[in-house]
Amino acid sequence: IKTDLGKAYLKAYGAYYNLPAALQGETALGEDETRNIKGVCPDGWHIPSQKEWQTLSKYVLDSGMAAIMNDGQVDETAIAKALASTTMWMLPEYTEIEPQPTWVGVEMEKNNATLFNGLPIGFRACAGDEDWMHSCYSAGWWSSTAGVQMGPEFGITVRLWSDLHTFVTNAEFN
């Protein structure tokens, strides 16, 4: 890390990786594959597959932890709110529609029903300049499944997933 900004992001959010760096030479999973890809994760942990992310989303919905929109509907923002930390989130500077109660930057005390504690990490463009994008109002983590992630020119963080298929909410693993 060469700059003070980069060092600050590392301290607050952890390392940002492009996909090849995150996978550490392993081949991304095919759609129906179920093996764990360790990549940059320590022993006992792996990069979650798209199926594991979908299982988490289904759990949030089925358990009633997702927030409800003004019209009574539940959408992907309702799932995000249940996974988002209760601090650091902001609304984008410009929005075309009225903010909904499901948005993570609205009524943040209602965020994090799951204790997942997702931080607004944004992402980084890796094509030369140190360009940090959408921090404070977006989050995303790599999937080990091919074809569902951002391009290799972007850097985002890795969310550790236990090989024991348990969720850890301890701040040490955030």
Indicate where each model-derived feature is located.
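Conserved positions within compact, well-structured domain cores
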Residues: I1-N174
